[in-house]
Amino acid sequence: SKMSFKKMQSIYGVEETKKFFKNSVEGSNHTKDIIKEYNIECDVTGDSSYVVAHHKNKFEQIKEQAEVYKSEFGIETKIYSKEEFDEIGHGGTEQYGAFSYKPAFAINPLKFVNGIAKYALSKKLKIFEHTKVDKIDKENGSYILRTKEGSIRSKKIVVATNGFYQEGLIPQMDGRVLPVISNIIVTRKLNEDELNTHNFKTFSPIANTKNLLYYYRKLPDNRILFGTRGDLT
């Protein structure tokens, strides 16, 4: 389920909640900067994200959410009625208006990662694939990463394992990192008649107001991607 900003504030306080949204904005901008600087082709689409009211009684909720995003966190937002979003986004039986927020966009994550790797290799950096780090030691102001194939010494390390961190490598991280699992399914390529059935126009990422996270977007080749939490059966 998704935690509302009010609940976040009640649990973590106003300042920590602001930091959360600030990190989201900075992360989006930083990703776009990397794509531009490294000249990565990763199917960037959309110029915002949308939150869609899936029921008519949710429209006031998203209007309030959009106002809080703008007033409390400085995030650019815009409200769309059901009819307005039907013109620029999509229609359907679970579309009762929406709001957009920026900065946001969609990418192909595999192409993004491959682009970073390609750039690193072009700068003569070494990438060791399928090499498990068994232990990290700190020695004389630097780190030693020990593997079965050998060791690497570095002044700085970045642990970028997503949620699949190996317990015991860095004691400060033990018990603090959890995987957030998502199930994703993609349709075949849809023709114009099929897309026009719900007037699906936007390529921006979309989520709706259901408590259980549900997101979707149109891909550049006119397939539709659907995603939701993956730890449920």
Regions found by a protein language model. Give the residues of each.
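Short, histidine-centered active-site or binding-site loop motifs used for metal coordination
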Residues: Y12, S48, P103, T228-L232
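Short connector loops/turns at beta-strand edges and beta->alpha or beta->beta junctions
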Residues: K2-K6, H90-G91, D221-I224, D231
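Dinucleotide-binding Rossmann-like beta1-alpha1 core, especially the glycine-rich loop
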Residues: S1-K82
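Flexible hinge/switch segments at interdomain interfaces of large molecular machines
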Residues: E84-T93
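Generic structural signal for well-ordered, non-membrane alpha-helical segments
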Residues: T17-F20, S24-S28, K58-I62, F105, ...
